[in-house]
Amino acid sequence: MFHAKKPSSMNGSYENRAMCVQGDSGLVLTTDPKPRLRWTVELHERFVDAVAQLGGPDKATPKTIMRVMGVKGLTLYHLKSHLQKFRLGKQPHKEYGDHSTKEGSRASAMDIQRNVASSSGMMSRNMNEMQMEVQRRLHEQLEVQRHLQLRIEAQGKYMQSILERACQTLAGENMAAATAAAAVGGGYKGNLGSSSLSAAVGPPPHPLSFPPFQDLNIYGNTTDQVLDHHNFHHQNIENHFTGNNAADTNIYLGKKRPNPNFGNDVRKGLLMWSDQDHDLSANQSIDDEHRIQIQMATHVSTDLDSLSEIYERKSGLSGDEGNNGGKLLERPSPRRSPLSPMMNPNGGLIQGRNSPFG
């Protein structure tokens, strides 16, 4: 019915018509209204060599590739499309390389961040430790200062108590010393008055130690000497009392106060003096009134020696008269009284502060 060879013959003719080979260039072109180039293996190898010579698909351009290949009938359209496909064929490798580099950089960045985080954590930890150490040391320093302040305050209180006790002790000692001095001073003044009076006056004479007036008139010159020594003895006693009063007031005056106990009237009442003796005693009393300090011990010893000599003379005379008529009563010579404690070894009288006599 239908013949089978016709379609086959038609298909064969179509294939022959579609593929047209250019003998000079060796290109295989289709017979379509828009002829298309068939990239053979040999042509592709020449394209790859040209791209490699030009520095890779990124640097190669269609014009440079066409000039390097030198194939007739090859147009820019053919090279442009094939170059684009070639670039797309090479892109997965590039993307893989870029991805690997990006992953590496990302990993390195993460490592860096991790290291930075760890280092920052270590730094923050170190800073916290340092801050805690500083706070601990400050707390210890504050504790030490507080203890030191407490010890200083305790030491100050202790020193204050010691000073108060010392002041109280000194005040008590001063009061006790003042009381004792007042007590001793009162007793000493009383004893001083009695001792000075007893030392100046001496023990009371025996009633038989002085000769009667009849004996004094008999002996003549001896009587005058006895009166002179007696008068001088009273004057020394008065001068001693006056010296005590002057020492009590610590003021040296030209004249002394008159003593009512030992006045001229009393002496005149005791003994009757002649005019010559009266003038002599008056002159001596006037001279003695202007004296301030007297050597008491020397005068007392001189008076006692002179009195002892007078008594010895009288005893000798009375012995001679006893052979003729009657024996007179013998009188022992008065003993020399020891030096008073108020007199110093040099013969001077230590003047007292107060005297019971005016």
Curated annotation (Swiss-Prot):
Residue ranges, annotated region (Disordered): 313-358
Localization per Swiss-Prot or TrEMBL: Nucleus
Any Gene Ontology biological process: regulation of DNA-templated transcription
Limits of the HTH myb-type domain: 31-91
Chief localisation class: nucleus
Pfam families in the cross-refs: Myb_CC_LHEQLE, Myb_DNA-binding
Residues of the DNA-binding region: 62-87
Inducing factors: Up-regulated by phosphate deficiency.
Family, per entry: Belongs to the MYB-CC family.
Annotated PANTHER family: MYB FAMILY TRANSCRIPTION FACTOR APL, MYB FAMILY TRANSCRIPTION FACTOR PHL11
Name of protein: Myb family transcription factor APL
Organism, scientific name: Arabidopsis thaliana
Gene for this chain: APL
